[in-house]
Amino acid sequence: MARDLIGPALPPGFKARGTAEDEERDPSPGPALPPNYKSSSSDSSDSDEDSSSLYEEGNQESEEDDTGPTARKQRKNQDDDNDDDDDDDDDDGFFGPALPPGFKKQDDSPPRPIIGPALPPGFIKSTQKSDKGRDDPGQQETDSSEDEDIIGPMPAKGPVNYNVTTEFEKRAQRMKEKLTKGDDDSSKPIVRESWMTELPAEMKDFGLGPRTFKRRADDTSGDRSVWTDTPADRERKAKETQEARKSSSKKDEEHILSGRDKRLAEQVSSYNESKRSESLMDIHHKKLKSKAAEDKNKPQERIPFDRDKDLKVNRFDEAQKKALIKKSRELNTRFSHGKGNMFL
């Protein structure tokens, strides 16, 4: 029964509001429900109809007479088939907005490209394993049991034959073969490397030395190999020193003077002794010899402490002393006649 409208009439193209029952029947605002779904009002009405139909079916079943177990089984099978059909209908539905017309639902997503190294042979992807397990669950259990990672040594497949006596015999045989083996490697003498037998080089005092320029070159510390020399090395070095001395002596050999040079040398020496005075070098040598003889005859006395004398720094070290003596020996070669003719 429509309500009486009081007021001006609606313009053409507009509809009047219906009753409350009509409003309930109108669809609710929002996205439309997908197919195979019904609104809550329709569900409630359907549930009422289903309950009434079930009640009527129950009354009919109570009125029917059970003729035997076969009739009960038939009714049970029919009920199971109806339940399966209902479950299939429920599974067809899905949640979410419906696809627009013209679009088809894809059953499976396209395979994604594999990023990374390929799996080794014999391995299956997790998706393939799950599909295989769905098809054959019994086979999946056997495969999983076989593919389990085994940690540790595998157990022996057969009986283990271990005997202490056989182990000792094998070990003795190996030692015998090692001792009696006449290979070329065993015949060669074992020579150790140089870093095992020689002293290392002098370590630099990194960060601990003086932070000034060097006033002179580094003094050689001498031969340090004497600490690690073997008898064979000492013999070899002795031979080398002898050969070096022979070669140096050959170089220092004077040339044989001729008869004329010898005669002229004797005349010059006799003239110098008779006509010339004694040289300063000879005078100095004579004084040193006489002084050394006097000091030898004097009794040794204890000398008192002298600060200036005893605490004086000796700047003339041993290396400089040796270098000066070596140079002084060469004076005779620098200021003497040549190795050829003594006289023109």
From Swiss-Prot:
Domain of life: Eukaryota
Keywords in alphabetical order: Acetylation, Isopeptide bond, Phosphoprotein, Ubl conjugation
Annotated region described as Disordered, given as residue ranges: 1-309
Motif placement: GPALPP motif 2: 30-35
Glycyl lysine isopeptide (Lys-Gly) (interchain with G-Cter in SUMO2) cross-link, chain position(s): 275, 312
Name of a matching Pfam family: DUF3752
Residues modified to Phosphoserine: 28, 109, 144-145
Presence of the UniProt keyword Ubl conjugation in the record: yes
Entry-annotated residues carrying N-acetylalanine: 2
InterPro entries: DUF3752 (IPR022226), GPAM1-like (IPR046331)
Positions occupied by motif GPALPP motif 3: 96-101
Biased composition (Acidic residues): 58-67, 80-93
Bias (Pro residues) ranges: 111-120
Record motif GPALPP motif 1, residues: 7-12
Positions carrying Phosphothreonine: 142
Keyword Ubl conjugation: yes
Motif (GPALPP motif 4): 116-121
Compositionally biased region (Basic and acidic residues): 128-137, 167-191, 231-265, 273-283, 291-309
Ranges in a coiled coil: none
Protein name listed in UniProt: GPALPP motifs-containing protein 1
Annotated source species: Pongo abelii (Sumatran orangutan)
Record lineage: Eukaryota, Metazoa, Chordata, Craniata, Vertebrata
